[in-house]
């Protein structure tokens, strides 16, 4: 049985799919842990090539021997809601002004996408979490 590697750190980043490069925020975050930055950038870009244009969160586990593994997450719920609503950003005062409306079907579709990353037992609970995110952005769910 192989011995377990000892974890030296955990790094969480949100990077455009297929566009990781050594510039900030990627370079400094990985550099302080001694990780080969170009190796990560090439692996991340290859893994996210088919999702270009989206922000993909990544969780990088760095080991003491300076090797690493990474796990891709689903795009942020806020970004998916903005895409579904067709707007660039939410409002400054979300509970006073509402910008746009999305349907429950769109919310359920986003919930199905995000289900793996949400702390929800079923799609209805996940949809309620997404609806709460929408409300906090000034998006009405109907």
Curated annotation (Swiss-Prot):
Subunit structure: Part of the ribosomal stalk of the 50S ribosomal subunit. Interacts with L10 and the large rRNA to form the base of the stalk. L10 forms an elongated spine to which L12 dimers bind in a sequential fashion forming a multimeric L10(L12)X complex.
GO cellular-component term (any): cytosolic large ribosomal subunit
PTM comment, free text: One or more lysine residues are methylated.
Database matches in Pfam families: Ribosomal_L11, Ribosomal_L11_N
Gene3D superfamilies reported in the protein's UniProt record: Ribosomal protein L11, C-terminal domain, Ribosomal protein L11/L12, N-terminal domain
Family the UniProt entry places it in: Belongs to the universal ribosomal protein uL11 family.
Keyword RNA-binding: yes
Presence of keyword rRNA-binding: yes
Protein known as: Large ribosomal subunit protein uL11
Coiled coil: none
CDD domains: Ribosomal_L11 (cd00349)
Known role: Forms part of the ribosomal stalk which helps the ribosome interact with GTP-bound translation factors.
GO molecular function: large ribosomal subunit rRNA binding; structural constituent of ribosome
InterPro entries recorded: Ribosomal_uL11, Ribosomal_uL11_bac-typ, Ribosomal_uL11_C, Ribosomal_uL11_C_sf, Ribosomal_uL11_CS, Ribosomal_uL11_N, Ribosomal_uL11_N_sf
Keyword annotations from UniProtKB, A to Z: Methylation, Ribonucleoprotein, Ribosomal protein, RNA-binding, rRNA-binding
